[in-house]
Amino acid sequence: MADAALKRGPGRGRFVTFEGGEGAGKSTQIKMLADRLEKDGVRVVLTREPGGSPGAEIMRHLVLSGMGKLLGAEAETLLFAAARDDHVRNVILPALNQGSWVLCDRFFDSTRAYQGSQGKVAPDVLNAMQRVTIGDLKPDLTLILDVPVEVGLQRASARRGSGAPDRFESEDIKFHKGLRDAFHKIAATEPRRCVLIDATASAEAVSNIVWDAVRERLFTAVAAAS
């Protein structure tokens, strides 16, 4: 994260991350939350990982095309770390310091689940990469969208149509079930930061649950700080 620094205090924006397996509906829910926040006068920056900045988008292409997998699990994780470092320095921190709310489709919890739990990269390696790339930056709220693996993969297939599955969509069912378990464990381990949301309902119903969680967890905190 180099010399970038995160401001503290009431002028800082809020950082909300969306996590979950393939086809959980993260992209849809981020857009719906952004619309609601903007109607309330909140400045919002939408972003994603891997990607979100010009340099990180290059890394995204390398990873999702499958080229990173050819290098091995730890090397692939280094690509994610390089993308995150660029993304945090050039997009996330500047937006938060300017008072905007940052809504991010995936963050370090996905690295824990995908590369840690399923890629078998050692926890000490992941922790070292996390310290270097994000320092003490943590999401104010993480919304983990949960759907059964079969449902998520069906949604992902319908979304891409005739296109080929990406690097992670093409993994076997055991991999995806392991991912779901990993996200459940993250939610259970950090209940103050994470909210596990049943995302099998309609987009509108899930959006209402997301909105309730944001109001309860973050609007109260904003009011208390002001």
From Swiss-Prot:
Domain of life: Bacteria
Gene: tmk
EC number from the UniProt entry: 2.7.4.9
Entry protein name: Thymidylate kinase
Biological-process GO terms, alphabetical: dTDP biosynthetic process; dTTP biosynthetic process; dUDP biosynthetic process
Keyword annotations from UniProtKB, A to Z: ATP-binding, Kinase, Nucleotide biosynthesis, Nucleotide-binding, Transferase
A GO cellular component entry from the record: cytosol
Record function comment: Phosphorylation of dTMP to form dTDP in both de novo and salvage pathways of dTTP synthesis.
Annotated binding of ATP, by residue: G20, G21, E22, G23, A24, G25, K26, S27
Gene3D superfamilies: P-loop containing nucleotide triphosphate hydrolases
Record SUPFAM superfamilies: P-loop containing nucleoside triphosphate hydrolases
Enzymatic reactions: dTMP + ATP = dTDP + ADP
A GO term, aspect molecular function: dTMP kinase activity
PANTHER family according to UniProt: THYMIDYLATE KINASE, UMP-CMP KINASE 2, MITOCHONDRIAL
CDD domains named in the record: TMPK
Similarity section: Belongs to the thymidylate kinase family.
Main enzyme class: transferase
Any Pfam family: Thymidylate_kin
